[in-house]
């Protein structure tokens, strides 16, 4: 059994979510960014350290009020790289959440092979029902 994917929620992401909901809008996660730089993200992050590719969310649904399931396919790169950082971007381009580990990669993207990504993302730092996919 896998554990929930727990990225760091960014301050910019929290601000964008609250601005959207105060305007009567929803904050929509529309893209997943992949990078190959290992680091220890903080809430001050506004972008990945070394983004390789930004891909649209393929599918998503809410598992609970503060947990979502997101899928995406990285199929455009012919270059090989280790996925060491992941970012979740809102419709307005704001980085909502970021994950990285200083020493452990998440996956490997081989040239000419699609990489199917599926994330169960815990967003417990955000109030219920503010995020859509």
What do these predicted ranges mean?
Residues 1-133:
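N-terminal assembly/attachment segments of tailed bacteriophage virion structural proteins
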């Amino acid at each position: 059994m896998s554990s929930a994917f727990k990225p760091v929620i960014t301050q910019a992401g929290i601000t964008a979510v609250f601005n959207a909901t105060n305007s009567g809008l929803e904050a929509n996660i529309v893209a997943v960014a992949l990078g190959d730089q290992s680091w220890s993200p903080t809430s001050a992050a506004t972008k990945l350290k070394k983004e390789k590719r930004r891909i649209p969310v393929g599918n998503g649904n809410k598992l609970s009020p503060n947990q979502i399931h997101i899928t995406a396919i990285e199929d455009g790169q012919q270059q090989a790289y280790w996925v060491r950082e992941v970012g979740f971007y809102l419709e307005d381009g704001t980085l909502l959440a970021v994950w990285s580990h200083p020493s452990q990669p998440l996956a490997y993207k081989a040239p000419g092979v699609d990489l199917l990504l599926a994330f169960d993302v815990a967003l417990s730092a955000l109030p219920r029902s503010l995020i859509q996919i």
